[in-house]
Amino acid sequence: TDAARNFSRTDLPSHAERYDIAREFLDVTFKLWNGWEEGAIVREKATGRYSDEAKIHAANHKGKYFQVQGPLNIARSPQGRPVIIEAGSSPAGQKLAAETAEVVFTAAASLEEGQAFYRSQKQFVREAGRNPDHLLILPGVMPIVGRTRENAQETWNQLNELVDIDNGIEQLSARFGVDMTAYPLDGPVPEIGGTEGGQSRVKLLTELAARENLTLRQLAAVAAGSRGHRVIVGTAADIADD
């Protein structure tokens, strides 16, 4: 809800609609970038002509969420456009990435989860008619590096002692859309229904809590410490091998 107020709304659109908005937003953005042809900038000192207007085109976008005339009032970059990076692991997020992105940033609590996501995302890319090799997948990871494994573990233990559980509870409340302060810290993680927030991270945290039988306090520590990303503790060689 707080995020919605920064975008002229009082409440979040549904999860599905947010991805519809994102897809159309990218359509508009691509039209604006592509509105400048190669050679549109001429810089003719003799005539004072900066650009070739015949090579600059309006977007003329009239969609459900955006109406944009264009053209873009600045030239596109030498490479045409920046790299498109999408973050998300829900089916809707994977579909958007498959259609539009070069890189996906995701979270995977284990190697098996990461491999499953990789297979799923690459299949979405194939279904979008793109080469699967043209989309890179970057899973988040939190490395704790030490000269020895014992030293690394000691560092990780010290960091865990500094975790602010209240902050973790705030994060869980925001992610799940439920006031987690209403539940006992040392009790089980409550079963929460569907959310219109970020669904993939909620799914990851819920499955992690069930798999490792975490209490709410322990899950809050995970949320505050690693945000649900995989933690690897060890020497530099351990982490590289992992």
Tell me what each language-model feature is:
Residues 1, 82-87, 102-106, 135-142:
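Hydrophobic faces of well-ordered beta-strands that scaffold small-molecule active sites
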Residues 1-6, 13, 21-25:
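Hydrophobic or amphipathic alpha-helical targeting/insertion segments
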Residues 5-8, 96, 117:
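Short, solvent-exposed loop/turn and secondary-structure capping segments
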Residues 7-14, 77-82:
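Flexible glycine/proline-enriched surface loops and loop-helix/loop-strand junctions
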Residues 16-79, 111-242:
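An alpha-helical appendage that flanks or caps ligand/catalytic pockets
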Residues 78-81, 91, 99-100, 132:
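Short, well-ordered loop/turn elements at secondary-structure boundaries
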Residues 86-99, 233-242:
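Short, acidic/polar
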Residues 95-110:
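A conserved active-site cap/scaffold subdomain adjacent to cofactor or substrate pockets
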